[in-house]
Amino acid sequence: VITRFAPSPTGVLHVGGARTALFNYLYARQHEGNFLLRIEDTDKERSKKEYEENIINGLAWLGISYDKLYRQSERADKHKDCLQRLINRGLAYEAEEGKDGSGKVIRFRNPGAKISFHDAIRGNIEFDTTELGDFVVAKNIDTPLFHLAVVVDDFEMGVTQVIRGEDHISNTPRQILLQSAIDAPHPTYAHIPLILAHDKSKLSKRHGSVSLVEFRDKGYLPDAMVNFLALIGWHPEGSGELFSMNDLVKEFTLERVQKGGAIFNIEKLDWLNREYLKKMLPEEFEKKVIEYIPEKFKKSDKKISERMLKNIALIIVERINTLSDISAMFESGEFDYIFERPTYDPRKLLWKGTPDLLVTKQRLDKVIELLQEIDEENLTGDTVKETVWKYASSEGRGDVLWPMRFALSGKEKSPDPFVLVSILGKEESLKRLRYASETLIARNS
């Protein structure tokens, strides 16, 4: 088995191309075959090196490795030789082009045969090729065009399966005619469904991000992206939705690829990415947190300690879809309380229906007393909860935990007070609780 992914370097790698590459890769690896990357760069005006690099880097990011790389432009002599043989045999000829006949092209002499082929996804497909006429295969002897170059390359590279988008179905009869003309075997074709937007139109830039690099830069994980791409149009046998690359190599079959268009569901991608973020080892996720924290929060006066980082990571992983959400959380001021002691109106320390400042102060003082008993080395959200919970339950959880949380963060919405203590540390937490107690005295006097 030999499959190939054959992109043109006239733009960046988009999700549709990435999925095509993935399906070809999975099929080849499952059958212990080879997966080829063929850069179809014969359009000299539009092909650019940076787009080729983008394609190669995108595949590498996804973990899709190819067995050999070809550039179509480096095979021009082989295309030219084949074209000349077709002309010599009378199977192609030079023809005038344009109304004034000033231009010349080379056309394939179409025998007008009826063609049928079995598509591994769509079943039998038939074409009456008389409708195609004598189609153009080259601008001139030195410039063969798409159909001829593809047929020659697939033949010489031994490609056995052509897995590509359904928009290529109309190309297939021309390519089968050319294969017969050069005595090349017909590969097995499998035309996968187009990727559609939520409105069921073809996915495009107007629907948002479509290039692979945009999703990478937004902080989606490659494993999540691979999992997501595989599920666009392919349906596994069981009910499971989480698949590693190794799982996909074992499970993927063309028979379970749907014929109709497949919807690009960004909510599904976000869900998958969250699942993969949660599966990361804590130390790996902590490295990602550091990577995505804005630079201004890494200065010496705002430096996050290792303990802080571990506890912040526990909060963040439950609340983000992508890694770039980490930057947004810091930039929005959500974690400002970590770096600066909050200031606030003391009345906000009061829980619902608790007008008595003195009672609230007494409860904060008791929390201070309890926290002093905890060894700094054993300070975790769990140990803080164990220490405070019994007292909070006896007094009324809201009456104790609300002023404790607000004193630590100055925010009505923040992590629970046990986690806050574990982030801020014992010393800083006690300072903030004492400050809150003092403001209540001042307010009461």
What are the residue ranges of the model-derived segments?
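Residue-level signal for inorganic ion chemistry
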Residues: 24, 55, 86, 108, ...
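Small-residue-rich helix-loop
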Residues: 282, 286-393
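Charged substrate- and nucleic-acid-binding regions of tRNA-handling and nucleotidyl-transfer enzymes
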Residues: 375-440
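N-terminal Rossmann-like or analogous alpha/beta NTP/dinucleotide-binding catalytic cores
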Residues: 1-97, 171-184
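Glycine-rich phosphate/pyrophosphate-binding loops
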Residues: 29-41, 149-161, 182-196, 415-420, ...
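Conserved phosphate-binding loops in nucleotide/dinucleotide-binding enzymes
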Residues: 139, 157-168, 196-228, 232-241, ...
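Short, basic, low-complexity termini and linkers enriched in Ser/Thr/Gly/Pro
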Residues: 441-445
